[in-house]
């Protein structure tokens, strides 16, 4: 468990940039320390925020799990990234990001080093992904400027989430990056997913049931509309 702050009421959007940078430095250290253990091949950094996401401890915190095998979802992602890289000698997510930056209508936030967007395959109403602009395959490769830019975009995105329904916005978020198996993994690109459940208000959430559970997920609003709504939200937290 990684506590974000000594204060029980201080979540990411209400923290100072320097304090979010400290969290990122902790993530870097844990990724390195755990990854250096011989039998650890995957380090998963994530946060479950809010009781609706199953968070039983209200103190703002994240978690880190480490294991010898690759989780099924990560292994599937890696296989797709490797396949694209072997065929094109290019990074799939870098090419994807370039296409999104040209199209622009699914972009939520862009700064010098990172982009937050709503991916076209998103299934949650306000699902987003943060992708590094430079080819970085793990969090320990960040420069000092990239650490700051990452802290800024984390604060801005989570602030927009809170401002949307004037509530402490629940979500599950997590970082996907290169495995810690000692291989170079040029196919990987650092990115972070946010999966928030809220749909129309602070009390109305999307349910994955019925056809969506048995057949295929359905979108309640388009990725473009979702990105536009988030983009319009202020970078200043509604409590201020």
Give the label of every model feature segment.
Residues 1-240:
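HIT superfamily nucleotide-processing domains
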């Amino acid at each position: 468990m990684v506590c974000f702050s000594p204060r029980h009421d201080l979540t990411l959007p209400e923290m100072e940039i320097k304090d979010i940078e400290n969290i990122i430095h902790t993530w870097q250290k844990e990724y390195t320390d755990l990854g250096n253990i011989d039998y650890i091949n995957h380090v998963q950094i994530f946060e479950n925020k809010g009781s609706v996401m199953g968070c039983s401890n209200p103190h703002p915190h994240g978690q880190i799990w480490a294991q010898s095998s690759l989780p099924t979802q990560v292994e599937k992602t890696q296989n797709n990234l490797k396949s694209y890289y072997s065929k094109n000698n290019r990074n799939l997510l870098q090419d994807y990001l370039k296409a999104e930056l040209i199209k622009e209508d699914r972009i939520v936030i862009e700064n010098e080093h990172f982009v937050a967007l709503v991916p076209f395959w998103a299934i949650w109403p306000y699902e987003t992904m943060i992708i590094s602009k430079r080819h970085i395959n793990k969090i320990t490769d960040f420069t000092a400027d990239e650490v700051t830019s990452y802290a800024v975009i984390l604060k801005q995105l989570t602030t927009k989430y809170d401002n949307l329904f004037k509530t402490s916005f629940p979500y599950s978020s997590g970082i996907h990056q290169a495995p810690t198996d000692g291989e170079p993994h040029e196919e990987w690109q650092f990115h972070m997913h946010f999966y928030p459940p809220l749909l129309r208000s602070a009390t109305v959430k999307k349910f994955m049931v019925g056809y969506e559970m048995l057949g295929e997920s359905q979108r309640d609003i388009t990725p473009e509309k979702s990105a536009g709504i988030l983009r319009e939200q202020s970078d200043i937290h509604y409590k201020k």
